[in-house]
């Protein structure tokens, strides 16, 4: 069963931290998390701009900045998880080039999962979520502002590749820990240009042919990989707007307390998922739903 036992959580002392921590507190058991490294990355140990004045007043001027930051993070973590948190964790305040340090820590700690805010890891650091996604070698969870509810619905876009198999297996592992959670498979059927219907298969219902082909492919996908149909509510949508990311987002938004799990790479139309327009649109436009990218 897939789990994310060791995770690195990038925090930047902004309001986004609260949403990340509350999401993890609500869903740590669902995800199988055992150890968390809460990391704040600083180019140098000067007082971060995000730390408010009231927080600064709590400490004497000679109090080392890294200790101030560590205590602030400790307070926020305790507030989210409670004083007797079952999750084992450590707090690390690291000086150096944030982007390189983050990738280094992922490797050193053998992290199964990196958790970041939806758009940026650290305000002003130059580490965008997209940049980390391109280079981090582990699974990545993007948590948006207000995306911290307890997960009830898991939306898994599929293209029937091995990469989407990893995504559905992650969803099944979540469901095994929380049986009441629902898995919604989603395949967006790409349609040819409108004039294609006038010059190919006239009167044959080409949309129906494409939809039927997609369902046959799904049947083979389920059979070949020994998946349980009972656990997956499969959905097929036509890409009428020629916007796969938009269809995925709209579908997921219809499900209360939902998250999206996607494979890191797949075949058409997802063949450049992390490195092409679909992933970038997902990261940039989905502002209220957690997005988990599995490798």
Where are each of the predicted segments found?
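A structural micro-motif
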Residues: 34, 87-89, 138, 181, ...
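A structural preference for short, hydrophobic beta-strand core positions in alpha/beta folds
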Residues: 38, 90-93, 142, 185, ...
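A short acidic, amphipathic alpha-helical/loop segment
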Residues: 22-23, 104, 128, 170, ...
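Gly/Ser-rich helix-loop-strand patches that form or flank binding pockets
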Residues: 3, 30, 101-150, 252-295
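Small/aliphatic-rich secondary-structure junction motif
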Residues: 1-58, 153-211, 224-230
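Structural beta-alpha unit
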Residues: 1-2, 26, 43, 60, ...
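Short, surface-exposed alpha-helical segments at coil->helix boundaries
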Residues: 63-75, 211-219
């Amino acid at each position: 069963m897939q789990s994310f036992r060791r995770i690195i959580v990038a925090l930047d002392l902004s309001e986004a931290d609260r949403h990340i921590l509350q999401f993890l507190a609500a869903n740590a058991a669902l995800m199988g998390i055992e150890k968390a490294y809460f990391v704040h990355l600083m180019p140098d140990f000067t007082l971060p701009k995000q730390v408010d004045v009231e927080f600064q007043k709590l400490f004497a001027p000679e109090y080392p900045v890294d200790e101030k930051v560590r205590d602030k993070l400790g307070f926020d973590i305790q507030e989210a998880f409670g004083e007797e948190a079952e999750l084992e964790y450590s707090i690390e305040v690291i000086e150096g080039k944030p982007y390189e340090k983050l990738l280094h820590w992922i490797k050193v700690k053998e992290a199964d999962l990196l958790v970041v805010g939806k758009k940026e890891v650290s305000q002003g650091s130059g580490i965008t979520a997209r940049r980390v996604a391109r280079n981090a070698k582990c699974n990545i969870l993007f948590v948006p502002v207000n995306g911290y509810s307890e997960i009830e619905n898991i939306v898994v876009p599929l293209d029937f590749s091995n990469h989407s198999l990893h995504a559905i297996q992650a969803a099944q592992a979540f469901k095994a820990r929380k049986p009441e959670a629902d898995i919604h498979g989603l395949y967006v059927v790409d349609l040819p240009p409108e004039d294609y219907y006038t010059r190919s298969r006239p009167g044959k219902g080409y949309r129906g042919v494409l939809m039927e082909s997609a369902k046959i492919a799904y049947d083979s996908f389920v059979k070949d990989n020994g998946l349980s149909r009972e656990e997956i509510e499969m959905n097929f949508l036509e890409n009428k707007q020629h916007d796969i990311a938009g269809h995925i987002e709209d579908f997921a938004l219809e499900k209360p307390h939902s998250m999206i799990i996607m494979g890191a790479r797949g075949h058409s139309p997802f063949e450049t998922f992390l490195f092409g327009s679909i992933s970038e649109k997902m990261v940039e436009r989905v502002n209220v739903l957690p997005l988990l990218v599995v490798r």
